[in-house]
């Protein structure tokens, strides 16, 4: 494994030497010596890795080599960047630059000679162990091959909810009965070991039709081993009252009575997933009243937790799969479309498969991991190698004894070891995140890119391809929403995360810092070899200022529940080689981002999302290698952004502050590599800056009253690769006379469109992109019903009308309209009184939300014809709505076919 990581580092080093050959002139002799040693090194690595598991010395050699490769890259890149910074104008600058250049060149030559000698010494020691030259041979897929496989994956990867449902059907029905029909039990507990399927079972119960009809509100909170009381209470309250914007500002003393009172007055179902200890319940329980009405479904590895929470608790013991069920689940993963095709499995492969699943101990997680491993093997010899690899190291059975647990761990580890090197890198990066984290995939993709785990396609395409590979192998869980093929979030099962942490420790991949007294969650024998830090506690920042961490490449803040303060600029002084710096939600003393940030010249990723910052230093101009920059800070006053972003020519992602002061003027026209640009403002930049940004996929633009709409249209016309566009006009702009110029039909790739544009009526359907899938209209003040136009956009999957998008009295959804619509939301339409839905309209609708439409008299009668509808949310509507739509109400016939009808804040 380490060989793969070293080879990956060597590839990056060779790329750097090739790319910067012109700037490296003058040290040719030293570079030639380095290259000779690197070639010798590459020929030894494969055999070294084969001997690694049997020799601590070989393992240490590989770690030494990895350090040497990193050091060489740091030395060369630092020299190139310093040379680049010195390329100024003027005689005095030229003299100073020449003197500094000669000094730097002498130093880099000396440093390279030092690295070369260290590599030579390591090679000599490795050769003394008899390691023979073996060709390093793992081939990566080409970009074209990956795109082809990506299309196949999108077509064949099974929906997780379907593939999970093996051997649990009877258990689901039993649990639903206890929750819905039996008032004796207020707490129902699902107990069992990790990986046995407790969460899968709870999820099926949570979404069951009878459960969704029975309760008024629902909350799902994953507690896990490390939680904060405030976070758990906030999550419950947020799910029960999602539109209360004050919840995140509440402390425990405010949350406790509010949540207690809410649970006393309603019929709610709460799921507490993964509660580890009785003491955890004791910390949480103060918000739960004894009064019956609400119910709780609790999952835990400890059967005693549920009984401790409620002595009358019904404890349900999750059972392992029998051999037949295990093989059925494995088949669904390996052959996701076998039921639809004539695929016939070789008898020998089937026999091996059935034998291999016995080593999974009946645990669904292990079965799915094995299925993901076998899905990439298509011949008898390949399956035999997997079988031999499992069988030679474990003796398993169909019951959960120690041997079975060892076999499960081995299968999960095999799934990792079977990954190609580039996927191992990506998988181990998930070790940064705390247990049970929902990881935002866009951030993850940009982390990968910042560390060089990125190819010639766009960051989004590259990231999606590799994440889909990990999901397909059942190493990662992703939320594949039916409205989109894209994954927005991903997470890991806790047993798989343990494998990830174990492998990350083995590879010295990162160090997790929780607090000043506990800094070794993943700590190598030599802490200095950890080049990545993940901060899980706000108390840990001072460690960075006082420890010497000159080789750290990645620093990610991964906990948001507590305050993170940076009170000293010195925190950056010892981190000069950072590539990744995520300071999301961090608070800076005095609101100032230290000017020392400009010394982090190697940075590729910088996030200040939600950080308390009121001042950005001009030294940021030195961050010329940035690929990702998020400046969406939490500023109460408009922030000044210095005009230095124009020098960050490598940027792929840029999110600007929502509010910038009047003095801010940004020249962004040279940022031609941008793929994502958000909060671009024509008040602070010229709309013509967009002309050359032809690689843009996602654009959010705010247009001022001084904007020339003809120029806007011509600039946007060049952005033919756009997939998402949000246009926000200042409220004072009257757009009635201009919307006709705003033609969007040439955006052939545009899938998502958001418009906050004043217009008397919606444009004709021919002005919209041909494949538009999602549209959100806000504050449009349309007087004419938009539905007759929108329903003719044949590819629409979701429509949202919000806060004055329409100010008329009546809307009509006609027969045959919206043929593919899955989700519809109508919010804050204060003048809407009547909504007509004709039979045959919206035949695929699955989710409907009605929110705060005070004059709307009733739900349309035509909803009874939409048999596809699975979820109806009624939020902040009059009490009469709820009274008419509950069983026995006069309008119940309209919604009785809908499995999940929720009333949220409708008791006023």
UniProtKB/Swiss-Prot annotation:
Keywords: ATP-binding, Coiled coil, Leucine-rich repeat, Nucleotide-binding, Plant defense, Repeat. GO terms for biological process: defense response to other organism. InterPro entries: Apaf_helical, LRR_dom_sf, LRR_R13L4/SHOC2-like, NB-ARC, P-loop_NTPase, RX-like_CC, Rx_N, WH-like_DNA-bd_sf. SUPFAM superfamilies: L domain-like, P-loop containing nucleoside triphosphate hydrolases. ATP binds at residues 192-199. The keyword Calcium does not apply. Gene3D superfamilies: 1.20.5.4130, Helical domain of apoptotic protease-activating factors (1.10.8.430), P-loop containing nucleotide triphosphate hydrolases (3.40.50.300), Ribonuclease Inhibitor (3.80.10.10), Winged helix-like DNA-binding domain superfamily/Winged helix DNA-binding domain (1.10.10.10). It comes from the Eukaryota. GO terms for molecular function: ADP binding; ATP binding. LRR repeats lie at residues 575-599, 600-623, 842-867. Potential disease resistance protein. This is Probable disease resistance RPP8-like protein 4. The lineage of its organism: Eukaryota, Viridiplantae, Streptophyta, Embryophyta, Tracheophyta.
């Amino acid at each position: 494994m380490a060989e793969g990581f070293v080879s990956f580092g060597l590839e990056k080093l060779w790329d750097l030497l090739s790319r910067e050959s012109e700037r490296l002139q003058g040290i040719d002799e030293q570079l030639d010596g380095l290259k000779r040693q690197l070639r010798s090194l590459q020929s030894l690595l494969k055999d070294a890795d084969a001997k690694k598991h049997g020799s601590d010395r070989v393992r240490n050699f590989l770690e030494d080599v990895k350090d040497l490769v990193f050091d060489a890259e740091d030395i060369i890149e630092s020299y190139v960047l310093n040379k680049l910074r010195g390329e100024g104008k003027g005689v005095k600058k030229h003299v100073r630059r020449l003197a500094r250049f000669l000094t730097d060149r002498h130093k880099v030559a000396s440093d390279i000679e030092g690295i070369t000698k260290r590599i030579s010494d390591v090679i000599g020691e490795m050769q003394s162990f008899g390691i023979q030259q073996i060709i390093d041979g793992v081939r990566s897929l080409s970009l074209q091959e990956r795109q082809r496989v990506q299309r196949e994956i999108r077509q064949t990867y099974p929906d997780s909810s379907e593939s999970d449902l093996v051997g649990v059907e009877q258990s689901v029905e039993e649990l639903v009965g206890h929750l819905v029909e039996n008032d004796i039990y207020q707490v129902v507990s699902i107990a069992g070991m990790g990986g046995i399927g407790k969460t899968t079972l709870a999820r099926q119960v949570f979404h069951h039709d009878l459960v969704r009809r029975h309760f008024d509100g629902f909350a799902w909170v994953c507690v896990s081993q490390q939680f904060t009381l405030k976070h758990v209470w906030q999550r419950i309250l947020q799910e029960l009252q999602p539109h209360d914007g004050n919840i995140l500002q509440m402390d425990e003393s405010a949350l406790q009575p509010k949540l207690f009172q809410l649970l006393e007055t309603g019929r709610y179902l709460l799921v507490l997933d993964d509660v580890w200890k009785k003491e955890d319940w004791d910390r949480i329980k103060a918000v739960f009243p004894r009064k019956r009405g609400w119910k709780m479904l609790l999952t835990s590895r400890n059967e005693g937790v549920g009984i401790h929470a409620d002595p009358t608790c019904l404890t349900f013991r999750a059972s392992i799969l029998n051999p037949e069920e295990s093989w059925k689940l494995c088949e669904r993963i390996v052959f996701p479309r076998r039921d639809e095709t004539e695929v016939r499995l070789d008898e020998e492969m089937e026999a091996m498969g059935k034998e291999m699943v016995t080593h999974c101990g009946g645990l669904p997680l292990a079965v799915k991991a094995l299925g993901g491993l076998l899905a990439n093997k298509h011949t008898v010899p390949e399956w035999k190698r997997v079988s031999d690899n499992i069988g030679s190291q474990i003796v398993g059975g169909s019951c959960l004894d120690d041997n079975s647990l060892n076999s499960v761990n081995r299968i999960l580890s095999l799934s990792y070891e079977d990954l190609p090197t580039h996927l191992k890198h990506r998988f181990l990066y998930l070790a940064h995140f705390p247990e049970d984290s929902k990881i935002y995939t866009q951030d993850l993709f940009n982390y990968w890119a910042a560390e060089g785990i990125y190819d010639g396609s766009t960051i989004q395409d590259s990231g999606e391809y590799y994440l889909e590979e990990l999901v397909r192998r059942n190493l990662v869980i992703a939320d594949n929403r039916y409205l989109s093929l894209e994954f927005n979030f991903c997470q890991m099962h806790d047993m798989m995360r343990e494998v990830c942490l174990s492998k990350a420790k083995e590879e010295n991949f990162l160090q997790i810092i929780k607090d000043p007294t506990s800094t070794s969650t993943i700590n190598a024998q030599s802490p200095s070899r950890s080049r990545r830090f993940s901060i899980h506690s706000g108390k840990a920042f001072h460690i960075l200022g006082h420890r010497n961490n000159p080789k750290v490449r990645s620093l990610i803040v991964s906990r948001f529940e507590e305050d993170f303060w940076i009170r000293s600029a010195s925190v950056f002084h010892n981190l000069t080689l950072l590539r990744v710096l995520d300071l999301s939600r961090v608070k800076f003393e005095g609101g100032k981002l230290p000017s020392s940030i400009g010394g982090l010249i190697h940075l590729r990723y910088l996030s200040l999302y939600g950080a308390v910052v009121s001042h950005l230093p001009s030294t940021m101009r030195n961050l010329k290698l940035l690929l990702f920059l998020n400046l969406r800070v939490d500023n109460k006053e408009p922030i000044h952004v210095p005009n230095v972003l124009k020098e960050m020519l490598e940027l792929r992602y840029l999110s600007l502050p929502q509010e910038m002061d009047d003095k801010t003027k940004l020249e962004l026209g040279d940022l031609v590599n941008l793929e994502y640009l958000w909060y671009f403002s024509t008040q602070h930049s010229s709309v013509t800056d967009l002309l050359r940004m032809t690689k843009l996929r996602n654009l959010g633009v705010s247009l001022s009253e001084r904007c020339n709409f003809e120029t806007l249209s011509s600039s946007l016309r060049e952005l033919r690769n756009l997939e998402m566009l949000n246009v926000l006009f200042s409220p004072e702009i009257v757009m009635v006379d201009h919307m006709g110029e705003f033609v969007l039909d040439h955006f052939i790739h545009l899938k998502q469109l958001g418009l906050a544009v004043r217009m008397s009526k919606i444009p004709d359907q021919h002005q919209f992109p041909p494949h538009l899938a999602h549209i959100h209209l806000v504050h449009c003040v349309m007087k004419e019903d938009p539905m007759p136009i929108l329903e003719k956009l044949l590819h629409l999957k979701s429509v949202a009308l919000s806060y004055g998008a329409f100010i008329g009295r009546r809307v009509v959804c006609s027969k045959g309209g919206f043929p593919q619509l899955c989700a519809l939301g109508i919010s804050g339409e204060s003048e809407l009184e009547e909504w007509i839905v004709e039979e045959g309209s919206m035949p695929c609708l699955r989710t409907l939300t009605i929110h705060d439409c005070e004059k709307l008299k009733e739900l349309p009668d035509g909803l009874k014809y939409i048999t596809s509808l699975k979820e109806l949310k009624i939020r902040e509507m009059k009490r009469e709505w709820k009274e008419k739509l509950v069983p026995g109400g006069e309008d119940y016939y309209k919604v009785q076919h809908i499995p999940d009808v929720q009333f949220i804040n409708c008791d006023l």
